[in-house]
Regions:
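Transmembrane alpha-helical segments of polytopic membrane transport and secretion proteins
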Residues: 1-19, 238-254
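Periplasmic/extracellular loop-to-transmembrane helix junction in inner-membrane transport proteins
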Residues: 31-72
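Transmembrane-helix boundary motif in ABC transporter permease subunits
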Residues: 69-99, 116
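C-terminal transmembrane helix and the adjacent membrane-cytosol boundary/short C-terminal tail
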Residues: 89, 146, 177, 181, ...
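Generic hydrophobic transmembrane alpha-helix motif, especially the helices
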Residues: 100-136, 143-144
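Glycine-rich helix-loop "coupling/hinge" segments at transmembrane-helix boundaries
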Residues: 116, 192-229, 252-254
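Transmembrane alpha-helices
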Residues: 127, 131, 164-196, 236
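Short cytoplasmic-facing helical segments at TM-TM junctions of multi-pass membrane proteins
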Residues: 144-182, 210
Length: 254
């Protein structure tokens, strides 16, 4: 009951903040001297979204397809790499520094190279998403595996358990919190990463749509897409939270 009350209170606070921002935005564009050309009114953004929804929705499905494919590959690869590095100290010592160093290179800098190597199709976009989503999953899972209480693994080994049983009964369950925390980051990045990749070239997608309306100075449509991307990311993160509650019912506080 207490948890539900806190959740309702948080939702009301978030909704109130959004309403305040929208009101201030409307006042600034209506009475504050801010040019509606550069910063369109909230109602104009809504109208642009509704009027151009068929076009926006077709681009949206392209972006979501790229995002989900890249997310699936990135999460799968991150899980496999984390598992292999946990099983082998040699692999951990050899590849973990490389894994960390690889994240010091901005994805925006890598994207043009991927386009040059792979063209303007779907592959460079999926590859960029994989690069962005792979790291948080791999590192979070690996840290969770390494932080498992060694006494628990020793106890299972004393009872005749092998590596499979140790992962099944100890390491995988105890790594779920880290996994879902990283998964939320990966989910939100997958959509943003797809849009960034589409900015650099492509034929369809929300990023391509944004470039086209930018050239026409249709700022109302640009804002509409920005809010759509934010909404998609929030919905996906809420979906991950829902899956987490179902996968980890013992974490629910009544």
């Amino acid at each position: 009951m207490k948890k539900k009350q806190v959740s309702i209170k948080d939702n009301i606070s978030a909704a109130s903040l959004i309403i305040i921002i929208l009101v201030l935005w409307h006042l600034a564009t209506t009475y504050g001297g801010v040019s509606a050309f550069m910063l369109p009114k909230p109602l104009d953004v809504v109208k642009a979204f509704v009027n151009d929804f068929p076009t926006i929705s077709s681009h949206m499905w392209t972006t979501l397809t790229e995002a989900f494919l890249g997310l699936f590959v990135g999460v799968s690869l991150g899980f496999i790499v984390a598992l292999l590095m946990d099983l082998s100290d040699t692999l951990y010592s050899a590849f973990y520094p490389i894994l960390v160093i690889s994240q010091t290179v901005p994805t925006v800098a890598i994207a043009p190279l991927l386009v040059l190597w792979m063209g303007y199709g779907v592959m460079p976009k999926i590859t960029l998403i994989v690069i962005g989503t792979f790291f948080p999953i791999a590192v979070s899972l690996l840290e969770a595996f390494k932080q498992v209480d060694p006494d628990k693994t020793k106890l299972l080994k004393a009872m005749g358990a092998g590596k499979y049983e140790i992962y099944k009964y100890i390491k995988f369950p105890e790594s779920l919190t880290n996994f879902f925390a990283a998964f939320k980051i990966a989910v939100s990045y997958s959509v943003v990463g797809a849009v960034i990749a589409e900015w650099l070239g492509g034929y369809k997608g929300l990023g391509v749509y944004m470039i086209r309306v930018q050239k026409n100075y249709s700022f109302d449509k640009m804002f509409a897409v920005i809010f759509l991307i934010s909404a998609i990311s929030l919905i996906l993160m809420k979906l991950v939270s829902f899956i987490q509650r179902k996968a980890m019912p013992w974490t629910e506080v009544k």
